[in-house]
């Protein structure tokens, strides 16, 4: 129920449970239907509601909600009006589309609840975004916000009194995971007790599933918020477990609550074309797991004679002639370089930047701030980062996950009531796998965008 089968090692591995051999204790997520679990086991299940002592804090909000959705999400998180029963809940899910300012809503909740807080993100560069947002939306002095890295953790464990000056902690999953691997998860339990937080917030809560569960098992925090634009996992097996873990957790679901206009400023182009791959080329894009998107990315930039021609149609008409800031997503770092070289050769005056793990952080920031055409991978820039004034996203990747498409189009933030943005997907119909992948996610697209234009 809470484990998945590892096809590589031919074994089942725990995903959302933890077993302590010394005490013979099995820990499972509190968000499950515990009465049903008790029925299955034929014995009582203890609901551990013992929480750490936390410090109250005073943080004043300096901004206001800019939409009815934001206002409702804040009420949901703090338990006001129609959501008053949430005031007694220890776990809440905030599921709203990218660009709807979940960050602001969470910061507003911190202010209203007056609890010392820890925010856990999945990437280091997002730490600064949260610190900047707290600085922007509240009166809190930046010196009261702690970037909880390994060095700071060691200081706190040596001298817990230093946490008194901090009101908010921001850290990454990797930081907690690496310290747990080094010292053990019980040591993490001590850390959370020492920092005296009453509220724990996960950003992009669908990303680090196993680590998030382990933190929950060993943190004993009064309240936890799970924020995401996609409360699901890409893997069918993992998503089945994921949904069980949050079955009993109240969920603010933007779409189900009727807020369906978050992407009505986006027109989608589905550009279907047939690159006429040979049997050998189709075979080369497969492995034992199925379709290989990295091999396909190599095929695009080396053998697909139509690929750059189609890309150029959009870049010439919208990026060069109309001046749109543009993001092109491919699957590999080498493909990023190939795309940049192609456009640099035909548009020498166009500012083009590459954003991926091979680029240092200062250059990455410069690319986000300055370049008109950005080439990246979805793993590097598919989520979380904000690109100011972005008008066009061209997604060249082969992918099955609805989440990936949602995150990619989510880079296109609303720029004004009358300003349209454009999301393009290239669908090579010469590959049956790519046709099938698009068909799986097409139904969701029809509900999201203002319109979908099919190009054949």
Describe each region flagged by the PLM.
Residues 63-90:
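N-terminal pre-P-loop "Q-motif" helix
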Residues 84-109:
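Walker A/P-loop
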Residues 98, 112-136, 331-336:
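Conserved Walker A/P-loop ATP-binding site and its immediately adjacent core
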Residues 125-152, 346-350:
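Conserved helix-turn-beta segment of the N-terminal RecA-like "Helicase ATP-binding" lobe
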Residues 163-182, 368-383:
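Conserved two-lobed SF2 helicase motor
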Residues 199, 204-265, 445:
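Post-DEXD/H (motif II) to motif III coupling segment of the RecA-like Helicase ATP-binding lobe
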Residues 251-326:
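Conserved interdomain linker/interface between the two RecA-like ATPase lobes of SF2 helicase motors
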Residues 357-444:
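Conserved RecA-like P-loop NTPase helicase motor core
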